[in-house]
A protein has these predicted regions:
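Aromatic/His-enriched, Gly/Pro-containing loop or helix-boundary segments
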Residues: 125-155
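Beta1/beta-strand and adjacent pyrophosphate-binding region of the FAD-binding site
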Residues: 10-24
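N-terminal Rossmann-fold NAD(P) dinucleotide-binding loop
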Residues: 27
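Basic/polar N-terminal segments that are highly enriched at the extreme N-terminus
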Residues: 1-11, 452
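Conserved N-terminal/central alpha/beta ligand/cofactor-binding core
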Residues: 7, 13-15, 33, 39-40, ...
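Flavin (FAD/FMN)-binding glycine-rich loop and adjacent Rossmann-like elements that form
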Residues: 53, 143, 147-155, 159-452
Length: 452
């Protein structure tokens, strides 16, 4: 059954040069890139904080791929990490040459970055529809406690993580069957852990990336990762299944821990993996949130009974929302390929680099040899909609390239590139496909982005 919604007038509450929809690593980087390129920028976010996966989900391992010989990206993404460290919102990450970002404290870091840049913040507003003139996007409709409102913009950046703007505006988007998507996760943290006893146990039985292959999982590596330390937890859950604490079929409960503080807080527990859930289906999201929390509590009980140092541990917090890794992607002017990310792809329209880090679909490759690929501008450009550009994990590419470009630091590369392009397109009154790449790359270099 359907109903007919009556036509109504919607108040225009704001006009801006560049509107960024979504404020995860890609959207926040896009807003900063556009602002630093001289444009008036508005950052729209459905939750009450900026930061996306870092803050709303609790993914604190921002650059856990980084090791001694990694050739890393440069630009706003590195700034997120250094500002968090300098503001007391990051600690040394246990498996890499990077910092784990405190997801709660980064809310304040993100606020600070937005305020310093003069960006107009709009929290607690949900994008619901594009405003179109033919095939040109002119703004968006949002819903909030204030009702239905309109925001107009000269250029719009889709950083929603699910290509919501592009999809509803009529751009071509692609989505795998949910059975083939990378699993979703409920992140959580514990308190009451005895740090000394826990670390002694970890050192007595160190785990490596080879141990990631278990149960329903198969993992492809290059071999060089197999002996490297990983803060991986599997054995407590095997013991718990044998003891009847965890149902036998839940052999997907396993994974990594993030930071362990002197206070006894053990954060960024990435132990719950939900397969067959579509992050664009609210019913799947509902089931995933509830099932994920149930599995997290089983995991905590298993750790309490089977891991030294966790005997008195308890739940500290869940992430605010389910962690989604894989939904819609745009069919872009250029779709990145497995060969691009595995074989050091090079592009004349590079907007930044990202190390050879592939994590997803049963593949784990860490960038320990100095190999990296360039990210092409064309992968940000959707087909079928003018004045719209995309950033984050929705950019164009195949499965294996997605396992690289979906990672948060790479999302900052596409975000900063999209932000600079949006600013220049608005200032020059040009389409995104009409920009001079020399101009885009010159501004990115001015913003300390490494292109080659």
């Amino acid at each position: 059954m359907n109903i007919q919604e009556p036509a109504r007038e919607i108040r225009v509450i704001h006009e801006t040069e560049v509107l960024v929809v979504g404020s995860g690593p890609g959207g926040l980087a896009a807003a900063l890139g556009a602002s630093r390129a001289g444009s008036q920028v508005t950052l729209l976010e459905r939750f009450g904080c900026f930061g996306g996966n870092i803050t709303a989900v609790g993914v604190e391992g921002f650059a856990w791929y980084r090791h001694e010989h990694t050739v890393d990206t440069e630009g706003v993404g590195i700034e997120f990490e250094t500002r968090a460290r300098d503001m007391g919102a990051a600690v040394k990450e246990p498996q890499s040459d990077s910092h784990a970002i405190d997801g709660e404290a980064f809310k304040w870091v993100a606020d600070t970055l937005v305020e310093e840049a003069g960006i107009t913040p709009m929290l607690h507003r949900l994008f619901v529809a594009p405003i179109m003139e033919g095939d040109t996007i002119k703004g968006v409709i949002v819903e909030s406690k204030a009702g239905r409102e309109a925001i107009l913009a000269e250029r719009i950046i889709d950083a929603t993580g699910d290509a919501d703007v592009a999809h509803r505006a009529g751009a071509i988007t692609l989505k795998q069957a949910k059975e083939d998507m990378i699993g979703a996760s409920v992140m959580f943290s514990m308190s009451g852990v005895n740090k000394t006893r826990f670390i002694e146990h970890v050192k007595s039985d160190p785990q490596t990336y080879r141990d990631w292959a278990y149960g329903q999982w198969t993992v492809e590596t290059t071999g060089k990762e197999d002996e490297m330390f990983s803060p991986f937890l599997r054995k407590p859950f095997e013991k718990a299944r044998e003891a009847g604490l965890i149902p036998e079929h839940l052999d997907t409960i396993a994974g990594t821990w993030g930071a362990l503080y002197d206070s006894g807080d053990l954060t960024y527990l990435n132990l719950v993996h939900l397969l067959g859930y579509d992050g664009t289906d609210p019913d799947d999201l509902t089931r995933g949130e509830m099932e994920g929390r149930k599995q997290a509590m089983l995991a905590i009980e298993a750790l309490k009974q089977c891991t030294p140092g966790c005997e008195n541990a308890k739940l500290r917090n869940f992430g605010m929302t389910l962690g989604i890794r894989d939904t819609r992607k745009i069919d872009a002017a250029y779709n990145m390929t497995e060969a691009d990310v595995r074989d050091q792809g090079r592009f004349e329209d590079s907007i930044g680099i990202f190390p050879e880090f592939i994590d997803g679909y049963g593949i784990l490759i860490l960038p320990t040899t100095g190999r990296y690929f360039q990210v092409p501008y064309r992968t940000l450009l959707p087909k079928g909609v003018k004045h719209l550009i995309c950033a984050g994990r929705i950019t164009g590419g195949d499965r294996v390239s997605h396992a690289a470009t979906r990672n948060m630091m790479c999302c900052t590369v596409t975000g900063q590139g999209a932000g600079v392009a949006a600013a220049l397109a608005a200032q020059q009154k040009r389409g995104f496909d009409e920009l001079d790449m020399d101009d885009v790359q010159a501004e990115l270099k001015r913003q300390d982005v490494r292109l080659q």
